[in-house]
Each structure stands twice: as C-alpha cells, then as structure tokens.
Amino acid sequence: MVGMMRKTKILVTLGPSLENKLDKAINLIDGVRFNMSHATTDYCEKFLNILEKNNIAKVMDLKGIKIRIKEVKLKNKILKMGEKVVIGEDIKLNYNIDTIEEGHFILINDGKIKLRVVEKTDKIIAVVEVGGEIKEGMGVNLPDTRIELPIIDETDLKNIKFAVEKDFEYIALSFVRNKEDVKELKDIISEYKGDCEVISKIETKEGLKNIKEIARESDGVMVARGDLGVEVPIENIPIEQKNILRIANRYGILSITATQILDSMINNPFPTRAEVTDIANAIYDGTDCLMLSNETTIGKYPIEAIKVLNKVAKVADEHYEEFGDRVCLEVESIDEGLVYAVYELYKKLNTKLVITPTYSGRTAKLISKLRINSKIIAPTPNIRTLKRLRLVWGVESCLMEEFDDMEKIINTCREMAKKEIGKGIYLITLGHPIGQKKTNTIKVESI
C-alpha cells in the first residue's frame, strides 16, 4: 500500500538540482513532471525505472505554443518609457502579427516589459509603458490577441508518442484555449493507442473565459500562475485560482496549483511566511496537488523545499474541515449521487474509513472531492489507476489482484479495515454486479 500521512499531493519538476537527489525525495513525493520546454525524451528515459519501481505518477508537460522575440534590430536594446517601436521591424516575433490590433498590449519577459499598440496601418507602432532590456528568445505574451497557432506541433507529437509508449499517467497541455484544444490532444493519444489522461493548463485569458467547457473535457486542470499572472492583472490571480479550483472540483477532476509555491527557496533554505500561507490557502481553496518547478529544477535547496511543502501541507490538511472550501459536485449520474450518500453516512456515523475498489479511479476521485476526514483507500487491479490516484487528494491507492469475484473483494476490504482502523464503522463502495462501470452500492460495516 502507498503510505502517506498528508492528504494534499506533491508533484515535483525534475531538473539539474533534483536529478542526483531523486532517491532522497522519492518517499516525499507523489508525482514527477518533465517540462518538455527543457527536457528531452532521452532525459526522461533515464529516470523511468526508479519512478516505476516506486509507483510515482509521471506527468509530461508539453512545451505548447510560445511566442518569442525572433530578432531585435534596435541599436539600443534597452527600451525606455515613452519610446515608440515598430513591431515586425524594430522587434520581430516568431508569429504573424496581423491579429494584433490598436490598443492591444505586448508583454515581454514575463510581463517585465510592457508595450501598448497605438497605431496600426501598414505598420504596427507600439509605445513603451514599462521599459527594460530586450533580447532575442525572450517570451512574449499577447493577452488581448487571439493566438492563431496550432496547439500541438511536430516536437509535441514526438513527445506524445514517447509518453504513450512509456505509459505516462498524464500529459499536460500548455496554453489551452478551449475544449477543441483538449479534444485534439485526446484524439492524438487515441491514435497512438494510449490512455494517458489530459491535464489542461489554464494560463491565458481565453482559457479563463472557457474554463467550464475545458474542465468538462479534461481529466485535470492546472492553475499555471506564471503565464496567467502575465495575461491577467496580478491582483486577480487569487480570485482566478479559487474559481478554477472550484470548477475543477465541481466536475470531479484533478486540480493542481503551480508556480512560485516556494520561490524564495530557490536561493534560501527557508520559506517566507507569505509562501507558507499561500500553500495553506491553495489547499483550503480545494487543490488536490501542489507543484514545485524552479525550486526543484534550478534551486539550491530542492530537498528542503519538498520537506517544507510536506510539513505545511500536512498541518493545513488537519484543519481542512475548519477552513477549507466545501465542494459542490455536479450530480449527473448514479455514482455522483452515491458519493453524497457517502458524505452523509460519514457525518452521521463518524466513519473512520472508506474503501472504494475501483478500476478507473473515478469513484475515488469523486469521494476525494467531498474532503472527508476519513481515510480513503482505493484498491485497484490497474497499476495505471494506482499511479494516477497518487495525485488525488486524500486517496491511498493499492493493488488488488483478485478483482473478478465480489465476495473476495469484500473480504479483502474487511481485512484492510481491520488493519487500518482496528475498531469502528467503515464504508465500502462497489459496482454491482462485477464489471459494472458505475459505482451503485455502499456497504456499511463495523469492527
């Protein structure tokens, strides 16, 4: 059984800082992310054995569509406030600029440099509102502009094929604009005969606008606060985070909060008070999982950052019932309705444990969304489901080889209950008869 004391899960990004210390981190984490903006498939390959051996969830994060400065033709590459530049001449992008209109903002280097288009005739002229040094290769955000680029390119296709072949549990899609983007990735995964689940990264204005349709089509969403904080006013980030997480939980899908979780620990062995508070608030907003990025790729203290996240998450989890957001699931099926019955029984009977045998993991995810204080154990015959559930709040997944006989399943659950709680009331959820794809039964038992 996958042992854990905290309920909020931890996903780390693998990079130079952590790669030689992964063995020290392996018992502190639930998933590993490969950022394909920097990593290669050869790099991923080196770590697959240790991840498989420890049943760690693998997430491939596709590089996605990213606009960059292609060429700077200015003599002075330090832009000054009030200066005017011609986009496409003074500053060339790797993007067709025809869709940029007067009044649109052009944000460079994570929003540190800000231009506003003041004229569009045969040329696009922008005035510098916030200056700074610009270089070729810097990232560019166009928050007001509809980006007409394919969501997946040739490099992404090769990486998706690799992820399918190597049984990655999740593929994360960057800069998701609408449900069609999600469907495109799902179709490609199907063409490669894979079953990787799709995490949609919400990091653009268009993604925010279409968050409900994106969430319905996705297996999970990520609050990607880096680019999102460039695309929308930074003061709106807490509200957008709460909204994204609430919608994800309403639809019963995985939710991940990312970017600058412990940013100060890139260079310091201790977090700031604000970071600790941010972690707890993300948990109380309803996130399943917290993700470290630069902290574990280029940071000086990757293990320390992981340990801090563990400690803070554990304490926040203990107080979820006092301060956490109460999830309201969309009830559109029998199994969605059934989990509310689980919640009522939990409240009335003070149940200590819920055991939810599952093939796909869906019922375990739904029960997780209710944020009950009972332990949730999800036995499964499917190793992929076991690893996917590593990222789901409060769920402890384990293998159950005997999954074709109802009586054997129930007896195994009873043995688990004796081991886990010794005494007390517990629940078992089941799909009856065997092979039923929907959970439709709750057994209430006591020891």
Swiss-Prot record:
GO biological process entries: glycolytic process
Annotated K(+) binding sites: 35, 37, 61
Ligand binding (Mg(2+)): 203, 227
Protein name, entry field: Pyruvate kinase
Pathway(s) the chain acts in: Carbohydrate degradation; glycolysis; pyruvate from D-glyceraldehyde 3-phosphate: step 5/5
Enzyme class: transferase
Organism listed in the record: Methanocaldococcus jannaschii (strain ATCC 43067 / DSM 2661 / JAL-1 / JCM 10045 / NBRC 100440)
Cofactor: Mg(2+); K(+)
The enzyme's E.C. designation: 2.7.1.40
Superkingdom to which the source organism belongs: Archaea
NCBIfam families linked: pyruv_kin
Homology family: Belongs to the pyruvate kinase family.
Assembly behavior: Homotetramer.
Residues that coordinate or bind substrate: 33, 226-227, 259
